[in-house]
Regions:
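Gly/Ser/Thr/Pro-rich low-complexity, intrinsically disordered segments
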Residues: 2-450
Length: 450
């Protein structure tokens, strides 16, 4: 078959930057109307197209450079704005971000990789300032004109307690409890006649019982004189245990203290206790410590146990007459003691506001009301979508709202955990969310009458 291609091939490249190809056959001159001018025009078209492609590539390159330059300027401006802005909202969350990163054992780089050291130092100096200001501060109950209530009467069977319930459990909204009792009847009275309500596991149905402050009550245990309140906020989820009899609260240590810590559940079980939370900090290089070597002194039942000497943190102690004290040195009448800081509430005065250099973290705190109730609180954190953590200022406000007269921070982070009646009722941020980490000791609540 004869070749049907036109002797004049005018092939255009379809891809950007491909050269234009023009093929000229001399036989085309035989066509009617063909002239030298026509041939020159065809050859000129190829030249014009190459120039046009060249100009297009140049304009595209300039446009790309312009976009990249604008993006770089935008990102640089945004970075400077976020790092140095004094707008309250920006400054608050920048501060919390820095404090939170620097408050971890192994994630300082989250701040140091992006933020100038002078900005980090400025933020963290507020923490150092507070620690310096708290030196020399000690609890004093001399201004307390309110007599402690005999909370041993809070531990009675329901038929004996019912008429005086609001005296010993004044934090409970009676109407909401009455509605619960009407709905559930005798099912919430145990075999010995004690009122026992336990919906403390995450995901359990809301009891509908509220405190007088409006928070959900998940546990009401009149056998042991314990109320557990669920704490919920925009960034946090936790539990606060109100223990009626301070005499039931003590410090218990790992059996292998000095060489290895234990899970809180094991410490609680070995002492036949009903509840426990973590207490002392411990030597923890790169987050791999085994909880054996505690920071600061540990006193349990009047006896000094092993612990690092020379610790500058506050001494948190319970006296023989069941008063919680915070001081620089152990009081002579202390029966239980550990060390940590900072002090949150001292003699009824709030000492911490906002993040104050400690950021958003999992927290554990111990406190006591003026009338003698103990407050053991754990707030979960570092778990996106569930609980990020809480600032010390916000936690102080919660304790203050519930009448804390003394309160001090305990070791937090991945060590924070509350164990009650055979299981964890908060979630550790460690690899083992139910058991948490090995710790040197715990604040425990003994079973009533034991």
């Amino acid at each position: 078959m004869a070749d049907q291609r036109d002797p004049l091939e005018y092939n255009w490249g379809r891809e950007h930057g491909k050269r234009l190809h023009v093929t000229y056959d001399e036989s085309i001159a035989q066509r009617p109307g063909f002239s030298e001018h026509t041939a020159n025009g065809i050859e000129g078209a190829g030249y014009d197209m190459k120039e046009r492609q060249k100009r297009l590539r140049s304009r595209t390159a300039k446009k790309t450079i312009g976009i990249l330059a604008a993006l770089l300027i935008f990102l640089s401006s945004t970075y400077c704005f976020l790092i140095y802005s004094n707008i309250p909202f920006i400054a608050k969350w920048r501060t919390i971000y820095i404090e939170t990163a620097m408050g971890t054992m192994t994630h300082h780089w989250l701040a140091e990789a992006f933020i100038p050291q002078n900005v980090i130092d400025q933020v963290m100096n507020s923490r150092s300032t507070i620690e310096e200001e708290q030196k020399g501060l000690s609890s004093s109950w001399s201004t307390n004109t309110e007599e402690a209530i005999d909370y041993t009467q809070a531990v009675r069977p329901w038929d004996q307690l019912k008429s005086e319930f609001t005296t010993y459990y004044s934090e409970i909204d009676w109407d909401t409890l009455k509605s619960y009792l009407q709905k559930h009847g005798s099912s919430c009275i145990d075999s010995d006649g004690y009122l026992y309500i336990d919906e403390a596991d995450y995901g359990d149905e809301d009891t509908g019982i509220r405190t007088t402050k409006g928070d959900p009550v998940c546990v009401l245990d009149t056998r042991n004189g314990i109320v557990i309140v669920t704490l919920k906020g925009d960034s946090y989820y936790g539990k606060m245990a109100l223990v009626k009899c301070a005499s039931q609260v003590s410090v218990a240590a790992s059996d292998a203290l000095g060489s290895e810590g234990e899970f809180i559940q094991d410490i609680v079980k070995s002492h036949d206790a009903i509840l426990g939370i973590n207490a002392s900090g411990f030597y923890d290089p790169n987050g791999t410590g085994n909880g054996g070597e505690a920071y600061g002194m540990i006193f349990s039942n009047g006896k000094r146990l092993r612990g690092r000497e020379g610790c500058s943190m506050k001494v948190i102690s319970l006296s023989k007459d069941d008063r919680l004290n915070v001081s620089d040195k152990k009081p002579s009448d202390a029966r239980e003691a550990v060390q940590f800081d900072p002090v949150l509430i001292l003699d009824g005065d709030l000492l911490i506001s906002g993040s104050s250099g400690w950021g958003l973290q999992p927290r554990s705190v111990i406190g006591q009301t003026r009338d003698g109730q103990m407050m053991l609180t754990v707030v979960d954190g570092r778990q996106a979508g569930y609980s990020v953590g809480i600032t010390l200022g916000d936690l102080s406000d919660i304790l203050y709202k519930y009448g804390a007269y003394q309160a001090c921070n305990l070791d937090g982070g991945s060590s924070s955990l509350m164990y009650y009646d055979g299981r964890a009722i908060t979630s550790s941020s460690s690899a083992d969310s139910e058991r948490g980490r090995h710790v040197p000791d715990a604040w425990i609540v003994s079973k009533a009458g034991s």
